[in-house]
Amino acid sequence: MKVTAAFAGLLATTLAAPATELVTRSINYVQNYNGNLGAFSYNEGAGTFSMYWQQGVSNDFVVGLGRSTGSSNPITYSASYSASGGSYLAVYGWVNSPQAEYHVVEAYGNYNPCSSGSATNLGTVSSDGGTYQVCTDTRVNQPSITGTSTFTQFFSVRQGSRTSGTVTIANHFNFWAKHGFGNSNFNYQVVAVEAWSGTGTASVTVSA
């Protein structure tokens, strides 16, 4: 193929696209479930969001930025996160069929979901320089992406929290797949903050 000067210039421009444009291309979904409870604010183009919540938060909220269709590609983030009650900083998403909700919990307040009496512990998985406790739980007739339904939750909870890094989510998907996770037909996938009690603040940048 003959490469014209105009095409070469376009190619060079594409290859040298600034980081903010790359963020815009990879981030195309805003998760905002009850975000008003956490004073949620965001800049989708810059890949940033923040929130704070106070004692007496009246309901669960889940907010974040990411992909409208999830994948097994790594996700990189950096955050300032502090929480005193029930809260997660996590890669969060859904699979359509079989319907499942998932969390790769990087940090949490005072509640580890794998410590729940209803959780089924599946062992550990090593990823990204750390060890994650893995468990599942079943939600019966609870809110979901299709309304009210019964579905499985998959959790990987990092032992020794972190608030920045790359999540090689394929490692978690592959482990979960041994226990019924669909590992395909993804719905949205975000870096999220969820909270339902206590107080906290978070400021997050998602870069991939």
Curated annotation (Swiss-Prot):
Belongs to the glycosyl hydrolase 11 (cellulase G) family. Pathway: Glycan degradation; xylan degradation. It catalyses: Endohydrolysis of (1->4)-beta-D-xylosidic linkages in xylans. Keywords: Carbohydrate metabolism, Glycosidase, Hydrolase, Polysaccharide degradation, Secreted, Signal, Xylan degradation. It comes from the Eukaryota. GO terms for biological process: xylan catabolic process. InterPro entries: ConA-like_dom_sf, GH11/12, GH11_AS_2, GH11_dom, Glyco_hydro_11. Optimum pH is 3.5. PROSITE patterns: GH11_2 (PS00777), GH11_3 (PS51761). N-bromosuccinimide completely inhibits the catalytic activity. GO terms for molecular function: endo-1,4-beta-xylanase activity. Residues 17-207 form the GH11 domain. It comes from Talaromyces purpureogenus (Soft rot fungus). Optimum temperature is 50 degrees Celsius. The keyword Hydrolase applies. GO terms for cellular component: extracellular region. Endo-1,4-beta-xylanase involved in the hydrolysis of xylan, a major structural heterogeneous polysaccharide found in plant biomass representing the second most abundant polysaccharide in the biosphere, after cellulose. Residues 1-16 form the signal peptide. This is Endo-1,4-beta-xylanase B. Its EC number is 3.2.1.8. The lineage of its organism: Eukaryota, Fungi, Dikarya, Ascomycota, Pezizomycotina. The active site is at residues 101, 194. It is an enzyme of class 3 (hydrolase). It is found in: Secreted.
